[in-house]
Amino acid sequence: MRKIVIAGNWKMFKTQAETQEFLQGFLPHLEETPQGREVILCPPFTDLSVLSKTLHGSLIQLGAQNIHWEEFGAYTGEISGPMLTESGVRFVIVGHSERRQYFGETDATVNLRLRTAQRFGLTPILCVGETKQQRDAGETESLIALQLDKGLVDIDQNNLVIAYEPIWAIGTGETCEAVEANRIIGLIRSQLSNPNVSIQYGGSVKPNNIDEIMAQPEIDGVLVGGASLEPESFARIVNFHLV
């Protein structure tokens, strides 16, 4: 059965003090959250230990924004699976467009990170999506098919979340129409061997469009950027209303 998965990606925002302030405003709203919704926070690495202690026993699961494919070694600036699990992490974002764009992530390295996440008992959130140029050229479907084909080699689809993030809609304020996002996510699902993989939409998700997004039959959740940084905003998204 497909789960509703709502993840907040904090990117490079929030100090430990700001994280504690966020939680004070956000946690009370979880009393209103319907059962069966997986809520994940993916903070910077420096906030993981603080969140792990504070969130213990709560509805929120802890996620990370990256994982290296080696268990240990001379990889300056990276973090390993054992380090994440020791910090209480259960989910990890892999292949986000910003990692691909700014840090040279490829489908091959994405696959290595996915395998490693699963090897250490983590559930990876695989991000796929197209740029505006690729979309305008009519390459969306073929590009995503290629990302899935290369990224999912030897990956257990029983322990996987996928996020469709049209790159042209990330941080731009421009949102993919909900019906179009639903169509693309349906195409993604058709390429999977497991029809019960939860597939999220990510790209300028906000309180004023969450209900329409989650009304789409193929969409199982959202990967939220900027709107996850404010307690009231993220709470409204987590507690979306089905229409």
Swiss-Prot record:
Any one Gene Ontology cellular component term annotated for this protein: cytosol
EC numbers: 5.3.1.1
Cellular localization per UniProt: Cytoplasm
Keywords: Cytoplasm, Gluconeogenesis, Glycolysis, Isomerase
Family: Belongs to the triosephosphate isomerase family.
Quaternary structure annotation from Swiss-Prot or TrEMBL: Homodimer.
Name of protein: Triosephosphate isomerase
